[in-house]
Regions:
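N-terminal intrinsically disordered/low-complexity leader segments
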Residues: 1-8, 196-200
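Helix-turn-helix
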Residues: 9-12, 19-54, 58
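Solvent-exposed, amphipathic alpha-helical segments
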Residues: 16-23, 70-74, 105, 109, ...
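Short helix-capping/turn signature of helix-turn-helix
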Residues: 49, 108-115
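Hydrophobic alpha-helical connector segments
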Residues: 58, 72-102, 153-160
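Short, basic, alpha-helical segments at the C-terminal edge of helix-turn-helix-like DNA-binding modules
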Residues: 61-66
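Amphipathic alpha-helical packing segments from all-alpha helical-bundle domains
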Residues: 98-104, 117-143
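Hydrophobic/aromatic-rich alpha-helical bundle segments in the mid-to-C-terminal region
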Residues: 118-124, 141-200
Length: 200
C-alpha cells in the first residue's frame, strides 16, 4: 500500500464507507468491508477513527455538506425568494433522483442506529446535522431576499426535513417524479406564506 498521510487515509476510508453503504447497505458496511474496499489493513481504520460510530456520523456530515454545497449558491442577493427556494428544492431533487441509493443511506442509517444499542447518538446527530443545514439555508434565503420568517427557523427546518423525508421515501417506493415535484412546489408555496418584508 502506498504511504499516505493520516488525513488522506481517513478521507479514503470515508469514501470507501460511502461506496460500501451505497452498494451493499449500511448493515453490511463493517469495518472489515470498509478497509477491504479501501485496500487498507484493518489496523488503519482504528488509527483513523475512534469508533465505527464516529465514522457513521462523518458519513452523514459528508453527504449533507455535498447536498448543501449544490444548493447554497442558488441563493443570490435580490433574487426572488420563491425562485431561490424552488431552485434549491429542485436541485436537491435532481440529485436525489440521479443517485437514489446514496440518499437511501440516510434512511438505512437512521433505522440501523435506532435498532442497535450504542448507536442511538448517530441517529440523533444525523438529524441535528439535517436540521442545522436546513436552518442555515432558510436564514441565507431570508438574508438575500430581505425578508423575515414569521415562524421560528428551527420549526421551519423541521417542517422541511419532515416533508422531504416523506417525499424521498415515497419516491423510493413508487418512482412518481411528477407528483413529487408538484409536492415540492407546494412546500415552497407554503413556506412563503410565512414571510414578511424585513424592516430597514
Amino acid at each position: 500500500m502506498p504511504r499516505m498521510a493520516a488525513t488522506d487515509r481517513r478521507a479514503e476510508l470515508l469514501e470507501a464507507a460511502i461506496r460500501v453503504m451505497t452498494r451493499d447497505g449500511v448493515a453490511k458496511a463493517t469495518t472489515r468491508a470498509i478497509v477491504n474496499e479501501a485496500g487498507m489493513p484493518l489496523g488503519v481504520f482504528h488509527y483513523c477513527f475512534d469508533s465505527r460510530e464516529q465514522l457513521l456520523e462523518l458519513v452523514t456530515e459528508t453527504l449533507t455538506e455535498r447536498y448543501v454545497a449544490e444548493v447554497r449558491g442558488l441563493f443570490a442577493p435580490h433574487k426572488e425568494i420563491r425562485d431561490s427556494v424552488l431552485d434549491s428544492l429542485y436541485t436537491f431533487w435532481k440529485g436525489f433522483e440521479a443517485n437514489p441509493r446514496e440518499h437511501q443511506i440516510n434512511y438505512e442509517l437512521t433505522q440501523y442506529a435506532l435498532r442497535n444499542p450504542g448507536f442511538e447518538n448517530v441517529a440523533r446527530r444525523q438529524y441535528e446535522i439535517f436540521l442545522g443545514a436546513h436552518a442555515a439555508l432558510l436564514e441565507l434565503a431570508a438574508d438575500h431576499a430581505g425578508i423575515e420568517w414569521t415562524v421560528p427557523v428551527p420549526v421551519l427546518a423541521r417542517y422541511v426535513q419532515s416533508t422531504l423525508d416523506g417525499l424521498n421515501i415515497t419516491w423510493l417506493v413508487d418512482r412518481n417524479s411528477d407528483d413529487s415535484r408538484a409536492a415540492l412546489e407546494l412546500l415552497a408555496d407554503h413556506l412563503l406564506r410565512h414571510t414578511t418584508p424585513r424592516e430597514t
